[in-house]
Regions:
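Catalytic binding pocket for nucleotide-activated donors in carbohydrate/polymer assembly enzymes
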Residues: 3, 7-124
Length: 124
């Protein structure tokens, strides 16, 4: 695992207008999901299957795409659309960043784990 974030990677994220992110599996994403969203860039992301508290909303916090052949054609069109619409792109990127900072930081994950353990222990 990583012990930190390479400054070059961080600079690349924060300098980007658009970040194309693919989840490593269909569940709740990984650290890069939240890193990309916290950059403030517009993030294109394949949807996650696992229901999470405070889910991302397509078109509000990020732009979703699917991995089908037709989905890839639509993805290209969406990227071109947002490249030329600074205000929309920046608004979604800003809202995504705000959403992640409010609901998806490490402390939120820790609290979810504690809540799940407490609930499991209450049922024992």
């Amino acid at each position: 695992g990583r012990s930190g974030i390479d400054p070059r990677y961080k600079r690349c994220l924060f300098d980007s207008k658009i970040v194309l992110h693919a989840n490593p599996d269909p569940w709740e994403g990984d650290a890069r999901t939240w890193e990309a969203l916290s950059s403030g860039a517009l993030v294109f992301i394949d949807p996650m299957c696992q229901p999470i508290k405070h889910p991302l909303v397509d078109g509000k916090h990020a732009v979703f795409y699917d991995l089908t052949e037709d989905g890839m054609v639509r993805l290209e069109a969406k990227i071109l659309y947002y490249l030329h619409r600074d205000e929309q792109r920046e608004r979604i990127g800003r809202q995504g960043r705000e959403h992640v900072l409010k609901h998806h930081r490490s402390i939120h994950r820790i609290n979810q784990i504690i809540d799940a353990l407490d609930a499991a222990n209450a049922g024992v």
